[in-house]
């Protein structure tokens, strides 16, 4: 069922972009996107009402994530794209009914979802150019790519932003882009991937490969809560190096660095040198990349030697919980782990030292650690601090590239922007997706230093 929202008028958004596409290098395209009036797409049939519980792992990460998926088929134009995707959304919302609700605050003062069946905000749009004229979407570009995602511009806080908004933008070449704006409290990367892939399966008339498991109370805090770990992920670190002022004084540049299989091999070799514990042992691509980016970013920001620096990254806890989370668990099944050391030690010691810190942070994540993190939030209501921190999030193992609404898999997909300046994203890339793109934002002078270190690998 689709209900029209008459509060909004048609809108035209525009942005100039320097196009780095190899076919039209050097051209300057002025992208205009005409958005039609938003509609509300409701579940096709009646769904459960009332308040829907969000776990403490969901509470910790209520940030907006914007992504785009570019589709183009030689056999099928974009004439039916809006109709097919909108209808399939209405059908898949029967399974993912909380997405049609609205965020609110529970009597306990926590985020929860009021399952009102109000619907997902859906926008049809048209662009004034061909899809390959968008340029390089392998790096975040909120000014340009943001035109392909619908934002609730007058929202004062996340409670006024629907859990999901969708925009389908048709291009003159017959291709189209699906832009999604989703609140991370509704699902992590795996949950989001399963939702979008299920949406595509419904569009093609197929049954869901992985029906969602919706009961998040299985991750309820213990009664009484038991905090059994230090949980330095919540620690506020003093900014002795005035890093925040550097971001204020200089423009932030967003760049994508491609680590192909050969570069990853070299990095992993460097990562096991000068270490008795790692000598002769291989390390994973994630361990080597995370260690390199942490050291290189710390050096690029010219942190003082005695400045503490924190590495945060998410570990999928689905198989680590006891018992394991059910297949299709719809909420956040990730937990943040961490490592803290002084910048001087991190930079002066070999890469293998940082790899060891990453490895120890991974080993920390057990059922007990994750339950303790859930209980920590229950007692303190604290959220992880990003002060003097690098937060790495990994999409390289997620199957967003397999999404198919009937036009084949996306030719490109990726984030519109990084949610915070401290966030770095790992994305799979290239032939057989064996390369990894590292996306990050740094002040201009720091980005130059980071690039020099990348070229030295």
Swiss-Prot record:
Enzyme's top EC category: transferase
Annotated coiled-coil segments of the chain: none
Disruption phenotype: Elimination of suberin-associated ester-linked ferulate. Altered permeability and sensitivity of seeds and roots to salt stress.
Highest taxon of the lineage: Eukaryota
UniProtKB keywords: Acyltransferase, Cell wall biogenesis/degradation, Transferase
pH dependence: Optimum pH is 7.5.
EC number: 2.3.1.188
Catalytic activity entry: 16-hydroxyhexadecanoate + (E)-feruloyl-CoA = 16-feruloyloxyhexadecanoate + CoA
Expression (tissue specificity): Expressed in roots, seedlings, leaves, stems, flowers and siliques. Detected at the protein level in roots and in seed coats.
InterPro entries: CAT-like_dom_sf, Plant_Fungal_Acyltransferase
Thermal activity profile: Optimum temperature is 10 degrees Celsius.
GO molecular function: hydroxycinnamoyltransferase activity; omega-hydroxypalmitate O-sinapoyl transferase activity
One of the protein's GO biological processes: cell wall pectin biosynthetic process
Keyword Chaperone (UniProt): no
Annotated active site: 184, 404
Role this protein plays: Involved in the synthesis of aromatics of the suberin polymer. Specifically affects the accumulation of the ferulate constituent of suberin in roots and seeds, but has no effect on the content of p-coumarate or sinapate.
Family designation: Belongs to the plant acyltransferase family.
Protein name: Omega-hydroxypalmitate O-feruloyl transferase
Species per Swiss-Prot/TrEMBL record: Arabidopsis thaliana
Lineage, opening ranks: Eukaryota, Viridiplantae, Streptophyta, Embryophyta, Tracheophyta
Gene: HHT1
